[in-house]
C-alpha cells in the first residue's frame, strides 16, 4: 500500500526553477512537470548568466501557454532548481541547509 501511495505522490510533484533578482525581495519562478524539462530550463538560465547573452530571457508557463515572463539577464543574481511535492504540503527547502 505504501508503494502505491508513493507512486501516486511522485506524480504530484513539480520542479521549480527560481530566479533571484537584484534588489527584489521576491523571486521569479517557473515550474515544470518533468525533471528533464526543469534541468533544461536551469541550464538555459546558467548559460545566459555565463555568457551575458541574450540580454533578455523569456520563460513560459508549462500549464498556461500564454503566460510568459521576460527578465533582464544582467539582473539575475542566482538560479536554483528544487522539487515541490504535494505530499509535504509545500516544497523541499530551497537553497542549502545544514539541517538533516
UniProtKB/Swiss-Prot annotation:
Against InterPro entries, the record matches this protein to: UPF0367
Highest taxon, organism lineage: Bacteria
Q: Which family does it belong to?
A: Belongs to the UPF0367 family.
Q: Which HAMAP family match?
A: UPF0367
Name assigned to this protein: UPF0367 protein PMT_1986
- Give the originating organism: Prochlorococcus marinus (strain MIT 9313)
Amino acid at each position: 500500500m505504501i508503494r502505491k501511495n508513493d507512486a501516486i505522490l511522485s506524480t504530484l510533484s513539480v520542479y521549480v526553477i527560481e530566479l533571484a533578482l537584484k534588489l527584489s525581495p521576491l523571486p521569479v519562478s517557473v515550474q515544470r512537470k518533468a525533471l528533464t524539462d526543469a534541468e533544461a530550463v536551469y541550464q538555459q538560465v546558467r548559460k545566459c548568466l555565463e555568457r551575458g547573452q541574450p540580454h533578455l530571457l523569456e520563460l513560459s508557463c508549462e500549464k498556461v501557454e500564454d503566460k510568459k515572463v521576460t527578465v533582464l539577464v544582467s539582473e539575475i543574481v542566482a538560479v536554483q532548481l528544487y522539487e515541490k511535492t504535494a505530499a509535504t504540503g509545500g516544497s523541499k527547502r530551497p537553497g542549502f541547509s545544514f539541517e538533516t
